[in-house]
Amino acid sequence: MSGTSKAVILARGLGTRMRAESGGAPLDAGQARVAETGIKAMIPMGRPFLDYVLGSLADAGFGKVCLVIGPEHTQVRNYYESEAPLSRLSVEFAEQARPLGTADAVLAAERFADGGTFVVLNSDNYYGPSVLGELNRLEEPAVVGFARSGLIELGNVPPDRVKRFGALEVGPDGFLRRILVAPNEAMLRSGEEIYGSMNCWLFDRSIFRACREIAVSPRGELELPRAVQLAIDAHGLRMKVIKVRAPVLDLSSRTDIAGVHERLRDVEVSL
């Protein structure tokens, strides 16, 4: 079978923004209780938010999932080992002992990847099956570049948050050149659509070398975008950019919960 069938979900984050109180955020008791733990993937929206992410993967053709979690995340492990009604997906776990960053989280899933291609996604973002299907059909490294206008107009991401997302510098051949902290002057002057990363990646095994070689960032983390840039600059990685104008539902803080829940209310989930 051609294409990519494995997905790694990064669910180890501390959830600092989710744990912080957001005055007036309309949460029910169950949502408030889980928000206090910071485990965004398990925020209840009729069912855990992560179920919607996994259901979208299954709809897109993926069959094997690895959840990267911390040793303390027993709620996640217990649910997907014993309670979740899995019929289309197999779910494994990889433990990231300490929250050292997204590149370190990817390294935790190396055994699961087993030398093949795999996608990497955030556990607090909902990507539609049409977007994930683009990656499912590929067998070479790629990143989905989301049009900033689409994130604002079609998703739930406010403009001030979009400005904090990195921008993708894409060559005329359609491959990634650089991941920028912010759009450069040339991008802004051009008036053309700016595409950003929402951590929707397709990797092969070459990414693991780069994840091991990068230095700790000024934020004190081993960051996946820095590993990608190192792989491009030093190892000759060619990463295709798939440009889309599509929504992403971003579950960053308590103020996002009600809106995301409403958007997902009619989404049917089959795991």
Short names for language-model regions:
Residues A105-F112, N156-V162, T255-G259:
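Short, surface-exposed amphipathic charged segments that create phosphate/polyanion-binding patches used
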Residues Y52, Q75-N78, S130, A227, ...:
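Phosphate- and divalent-cation-binding pockets in alpha/beta enzyme and binding domains
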Residues S2-A7, I179-L271:
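Conserved alpha/beta core of the MobA/IspD/sugar-nucleotide pyrophosphorylase nucleotidyltransferase superfamily
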Residues M42, L168-V170, V241:
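A structural signal for short hydrophobic beta-strand segments in well-ordered beta-sheet cores
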Residues S123-Y126:
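The conserved acidic donor/metal-binding loop of glycosyltransferases
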Residues G128-R209, I214:
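Conserved core of the sugar-phosphate nucleotidyltransferase
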